[in-house]
Structures are given as structure tokens and as C-alpha cells.
Amino acid sequence: MRPLLHASLVNDRYGDPAVYVETLFEKQALLFDLGDISALPPRKIQRIEQAFISHAHIDHFFGFDLLLRMLVGRDKIVHVFGPEGLIDRVGHKLKAYQWNLVDRFLCDLIFDVSEIDASGLARAARFRLKNAFSEEKRETEALPDGLVCDE
């Protein structure tokens, strides 16, 4: 029996941390840490539906810009999970770019970002391309038994 998940390091042991996990029979993937992901082909980057960020050091978060670049112009929702402060960090990255041409895109790219604090609460926000990635706050919720994602 083949495993349902296939994990692989994106870089060698001296490169930025990033673990790419493909799901068998589905064209979707998970990413654990978002270091340099330039070694991934675009088709693999475009499959990423969930990214889990351990902390915001540059070697764990540098790849966000390439993820963004590969997904702009596609209908996609990407769920991003990480520590406190992640919503602000993602928001700042998205605000660093000019989005004056968003009306030309028929598709909408959405980042649903959840930051988890030490007490197990998850604060969430949504950033949509159609809204020039303005932050839309979402409800804070308690995580049952520390479960971050149940898909």
C-alpha cells in the first residue's frame, strides 16, 4: 500500500528549511516552513494549499514572495498557519507591492492567515487580491486539543 502523503525536503541540509508534502491522488500539497522554495517547479508551488510557518526568521519565511508570484492570477485559497505576529508580517509583505492592476485579473487569490498564540487561541485574517490584499479580520477561535487544521 502506497502512503497517502509523500514528504520531501525542498533544499539540501544546508539550505533554507522547507518540507513539501504531496497528497496521493489529489493535486494539492502542504508546505512546512517557507524558506527558499525556488528549487520547486512552478506546478508544485501552484499545488500548495496550506503552509505552516514555525517562526518568522528569514530562512523560514523568505519563500512567501515566490509563492505569491506563482499564484497571482489564479483562483486559489492558501491557508497559512504560524505564530503570533504572522498576520502583520504577511500583511506587510503584501502591502510592499503595488496592486493597481488587480481589476485586470478575473481570478481571486486569497490568503487565509491564522496565527496561534501560546494559550491555543487562533487569530485569523483574510487577504484577497480583489481587495488589493487589504486585511479582513476574522473571528478568533480556540483550537480544540491544539488541532490547527483538520483537512
Regions found by a protein language model. Give the residues of each.
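Binuclear metal-dependent hydrolase catalytic cores
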Residues: 1-151
